[in-house]
Protein backbone atom coordinates (compact mmCIF):
# COMPACT_ATOMS: atom_id res chain seq x y z
CA UNK A 1 0.00 0.00 0.00
CA UNK A 2 2.87 2.36 0.84
CA UNK A 3 4.39 1.67 -2.57
CA UNK A 4 1.10 2.53 -4.29
CA UNK A 5 0.91 5.78 -2.34
CA UNK A 6 4.40 6.68 -3.51
CA UNK A 7 3.43 5.93 -7.12
CA UNK A 8 0.27 8.03 -6.75
CA UNK A 9 2.34 10.89 -5.31
CA UNK A 10 4.82 10.75 -8.20
CA UNK A 11 1.95 10.64 -10.69
CA UNK A 12 0.33 13.63 -9.01
CA UNK A 13 3.61 15.57 -9.19
CA UNK A 14 3.91 14.72 -12.89
CA UNK A 15 0.38 16.03 -13.51
CA UNK A 16 1.14 19.23 -11.61
CA UNK A 17 4.32 19.67 -13.62
CA UNK A 18 2.39 19.25 -16.86
CA UNK A 19 -0.23 21.71 -15.66
CA UNK A 20 2.45 24.21 -14.72
CA UNK A 21 4.06 23.92 -18.14
CA UNK A 22 0.69 24.36 -19.84
CA UNK A 23 -0.01 27.51 -17.81
CA UNK A 24 3.42 28.94 -18.63
CA UNK A 25 2.89 28.27 -22.32
CA UNK A 26 -0.51 30.00 -22.27
CA UNK A 27 0.80 33.04 -20.40
CA UNK A 28 3.83 33.26 -22.67
CA UNK A 29 1.39 34.14 -25.46
CA UNK A 30 -0.19 36.85 -23.29
CA UNK A 31 2.56 39.00 -21.71
CA UNK A 32 0.07 41.63 -20.53
CA UNK A 33 -1.64 39.01 -18.35
CA UNK A 34 1.73 38.01 -16.90
CA UNK A 35 2.42 41.57 -15.81
CA UNK A 36 -1.11 42.07 -14.49
CA UNK A 37 -0.66 38.96 -12.33
CA UNK A 38 2.62 40.28 -10.98
CA UNK A 39 0.95 43.54 -9.94
CA UNK A 40 -2.25 41.89 -8.62
CA UNK A 41 -4.35 43.66 -11.25
CA UNK A 42 -6.19 40.60 -12.52
CA UNK A 43 -8.70 38.25 -10.91
CA UNK A 44 -7.14 34.79 -10.80
CA UNK A 45 -10.47 32.96 -10.99
CA UNK A 46 -11.42 34.90 -14.11
CA UNK A 47 -8.02 34.17 -15.63
CA UNK A 48 -8.42 30.47 -14.83
CA UNK A 49 -11.80 30.38 -16.60
CA UNK A 50 -10.27 32.09 -19.62
CA UNK A 51 -7.33 29.68 -19.84
CA UNK A 52 -9.28 26.52 -18.95
CA UNK A 53 -10.31 25.46 -22.51
CA UNK A 54 -6.84 26.01 -23.95
CA UNK A 55 -5.04 24.23 -21.12
CA UNK A 56 -7.49 21.32 -21.17
CA UNK A 57 -6.77 20.93 -24.89
CA UNK A 58 -3.01 21.12 -24.32
CA UNK A 59 -3.12 18.45 -21.63
CA UNK A 60 -5.59 16.23 -23.48
CA UNK A 61 -8.07 16.13 -20.62
CA UNK A 62 -10.41 18.41 -18.72
CA UNK A 63 -8.71 20.54 -16.09
CA UNK A 64 -10.85 21.85 -13.25
CA UNK A 65 -10.97 25.57 -12.64
CA UNK A 66 -10.04 25.07 -8.98
CA UNK A 67 -6.87 23.21 -9.98
CA UNK A 68 -5.96 26.03 -12.34
CA UNK A 69 -6.52 28.67 -9.66
CA UNK A 70 -4.27 26.78 -7.23
CA UNK A 71 -1.54 26.26 -9.83
CA UNK A 72 -1.59 29.92 -10.87
CA UNK A 73 -1.31 31.04 -7.24
CA UNK A 74 1.69 28.76 -6.66
CA UNK A 75 3.64 29.64 -9.78
CA UNK A 76 6.86 31.64 -9.72
CA UNK A 77 7.14 34.88 -11.73
CA UNK A 78 8.82 34.40 -15.07
CA UNK A 79 12.40 35.50 -15.63
CA UNK A 80 11.44 38.62 -17.56
CA UNK A 81 9.44 39.91 -14.61
CA UNK A 82 12.24 39.17 -12.18
CA UNK A 83 14.37 41.49 -14.31
CA UNK A 84 11.73 44.25 -14.32
CA UNK A 85 13.35 46.25 -11.56
CA UNK A 86 16.77 46.04 -13.21
CA UNK A 87 15.25 47.10 -16.52
CA UNK A 88 13.52 50.08 -14.89
CA UNK A 89 16.81 51.18 -13.37
CA UNK A 90 18.48 51.00 -16.78
CA UNK A 91 15.70 53.00 -18.44
CA UNK A 92 16.14 55.74 -15.84
CA UNK A 93 19.70 56.11 -17.19
CA UNK A 94 18.59 56.83 -20.76
CA UNK A 95 19.75 60.08 -22.32
CA UNK A 96 17.84 62.94 -23.88
CA UNK A 97 14.64 62.54 -25.87
CA UNK A 98 14.64 64.33 -29.22
CA UNK A 99 11.44 65.01 -31.18
CA UNK A 100 11.33 65.77 -34.90
CA UNK A 101 8.14 66.72 -36.71
CA UNK A 102 7.00 67.29 -40.30
CA UNK A 103 8.13 63.88 -41.52
CA UNK A 104 6.86 61.45 -44.16
CA UNK A 105 7.56 57.78 -44.92
CA UNK A 106 7.70 56.14 -48.35
CA UNK A 107 8.01 52.41 -48.97
CA UNK A 108 9.28 51.13 -52.33
CA UNK A 109 9.75 47.66 -53.78
CA UNK A 110 13.44 46.84 -53.97
CA UNK A 111 14.99 47.02 -57.42
CA UNK A 112 18.45 46.93 -58.99
CA UNK A 113 18.30 50.70 -59.51
CA UNK A 114 17.13 51.63 -56.02
CA UNK A 115 20.56 51.85 -54.28
CA UNK A 116 21.90 54.25 -56.90
CA UNK A 117 18.81 56.43 -56.56
CA UNK A 118 19.19 56.47 -52.79
CA UNK A 119 22.78 57.62 -53.23
CA UNK A 120 21.64 60.41 -55.55
CA UNK A 121 19.09 61.55 -53.00
CA UNK A 122 21.69 61.61 -50.21
CA UNK A 123 24.18 63.54 -52.33
CA UNK A 124 21.56 66.23 -52.90
CA UNK A 125 20.66 66.77 -49.25
CA UNK A 126 24.00 66.03 -47.54
CA UNK A 127 24.74 69.73 -47.01
CA UNK A 128 21.56 70.15 -44.93
CA UNK A 129 22.70 68.96 -41.51
CA UNK A 130 19.24 69.51 -40.04
CA UNK A 131 17.54 67.21 -42.53
CA UNK A 132 16.07 64.00 -41.13
CA UNK A 133 16.24 60.85 -43.21
CA UNK A 134 16.47 57.12 -42.67
CA UNK A 135 16.65 54.15 -45.04
CA UNK A 136 15.42 50.78 -43.78
CA UNK A 137 15.81 47.81 -46.09
CA UNK A 138 13.82 44.61 -45.81
CA UNK A 139 14.10 41.53 -48.00
CA UNK A 140 11.77 42.87 -50.67
CA UNK A 141 11.12 46.52 -49.83
CA UNK A 142 12.77 49.68 -48.54
CA UNK A 143 11.23 52.39 -46.36
CA UNK A 144 12.51 55.95 -46.42
CA UNK A 145 11.57 58.32 -43.59
CA UNK A 146 12.45 61.93 -44.37
CA UNK A 147 11.66 65.58 -43.74
CA UNK A 148 8.55 66.63 -45.64
CA UNK A 149 10.40 69.43 -47.42
CA UNK A 150 12.33 66.81 -49.40
CA UNK A 151 9.29 64.85 -50.59
CA UNK A 152 9.31 66.44 -54.05
CA UNK A 153 13.00 65.66 -54.46
CA UNK A 154 12.47 62.05 -53.38
CA UNK A 155 9.61 61.56 -55.83
CA UNK A 156 11.74 62.99 -58.61
CA UNK A 157 14.72 60.77 -57.80
CA UNK A 158 12.55 57.66 -57.33
CA UNK A 159 10.69 58.12 -60.60
CA UNK A 160 10.04 54.70 -62.12
CA UNK A 161 10.18 52.82 -58.80
CA UNK A 162 7.13 51.00 -57.43
CA UNK A 163 5.66 52.83 -54.43
CA UNK A 164 3.97 50.45 -51.98
CA UNK A 165 2.88 52.88 -49.29
CA UNK A 166 3.19 56.50 -48.20
CA UNK A 167 2.54 57.98 -44.75
CA UNK A 168 2.31 61.70 -44.04
CA UNK A 169 2.13 64.02 -41.03
CA UNK A 170 4.56 61.95 -38.97
CA UNK A 171 6.86 62.74 -36.06
CA UNK A 172 9.86 60.90 -34.63
CA UNK A 173 10.82 60.39 -30.99
CA UNK A 174 14.50 59.49 -30.61
CA UNK A 175 15.97 58.07 -27.40
CA UNK A 176 19.69 58.22 -26.66
CA UNK A 177 20.75 54.77 -25.43
CA UNK A 178 23.74 53.82 -23.24
CA UNK A 179 26.37 51.74 -25.01
CA UNK A 180 25.32 48.64 -23.06
CA UNK A 181 21.72 48.75 -24.32
CA UNK A 182 22.23 45.87 -26.76
CA UNK A 183 22.83 43.56 -23.79
CA UNK A 184 19.60 44.48 -21.99
CA UNK A 185 16.82 41.92 -22.40
CA UNK A 186 13.35 43.33 -22.97
CA UNK A 187 14.34 46.97 -23.52
CA UNK A 188 12.36 47.50 -26.72
CA UNK A 189 9.44 45.42 -25.48
CA UNK A 190 9.24 47.66 -22.41
CA UNK A 191 8.72 50.72 -24.62
CA UNK A 192 6.39 48.92 -27.06
CA UNK A 193 4.21 47.77 -24.17
CA UNK A 194 3.76 51.23 -22.67
CA UNK A 195 3.26 52.98 -26.00
CA UNK A 196 0.69 50.35 -26.99
CA UNK A 197 -1.06 50.70 -23.62
CA UNK A 198 -1.41 54.42 -24.34
CA UNK A 199 -3.21 53.54 -27.58
CA UNK A 200 -0.50 54.96 -29.86
CA UNK A 201 0.25 53.02 -33.07
CA UNK A 202 3.93 52.97 -34.05
CA UNK A 203 4.33 53.66 -37.77
CA UNK A 204 8.05 52.88 -38.08
CA UNK A 205 10.97 51.88 -35.85
CA UNK A 206 14.50 53.06 -36.57
CA UNK A 207 17.31 51.53 -34.53
CA UNK A 208 21.05 52.21 -34.43
CA UNK A 209 23.67 51.19 -31.88
CA UNK A 210 23.02 54.05 -29.46
CA UNK A 211 19.65 55.40 -30.61
CA UNK A 212 16.09 54.14 -30.82
CA UNK A 213 13.55 56.11 -32.84
CA UNK A 214 9.79 55.58 -32.80
CA UNK A 215 7.90 57.17 -35.69
CA UNK A 216 4.28 57.99 -34.88
CA UNK A 217 1.51 60.12 -36.32
CA UNK A 218 1.94 63.76 -35.36
CA UNK A 219 -1.44 63.73 -33.63
CA UNK A 220 -0.05 61.08 -31.24
CA UNK A 221 3.43 62.47 -30.62
CA UNK A 222 2.57 64.39 -27.43
CA UNK A 223 0.96 61.33 -25.85
CA UNK A 224 3.83 59.08 -26.94
CA UNK A 225 6.40 61.54 -25.57
CA UNK A 226 4.56 61.85 -22.25
CA UNK A 227 4.34 58.06 -21.98
CA UNK A 228 8.04 57.54 -22.65
CA UNK A 229 9.08 60.38 -20.37
CA UNK A 230 6.90 59.03 -17.56
CA UNK A 231 8.43 55.55 -17.64
CA UNK A 232 11.89 57.10 -17.97
CA UNK A 233 11.31 59.15 -14.85
CA UNK A 234 8.48 57.44 -12.95
CA UNK A 235 6.61 59.49 -10.40
Language model feature labels by segment:
Residues 3-16:
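Short, Lys/Arg-enriched N-terminal segments with co-localized hydrophobic residues
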Residues 15-57:
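Long amphipathic alpha-helical segments
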Amino acid sequence: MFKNKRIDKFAQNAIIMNLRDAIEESLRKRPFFEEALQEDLINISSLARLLQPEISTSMGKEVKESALVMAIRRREPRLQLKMQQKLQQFIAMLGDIVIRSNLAAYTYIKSAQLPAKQARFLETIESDHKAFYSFTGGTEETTIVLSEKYESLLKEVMNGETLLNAEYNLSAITLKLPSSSSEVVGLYYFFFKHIASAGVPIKEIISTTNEATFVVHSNDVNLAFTTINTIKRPV
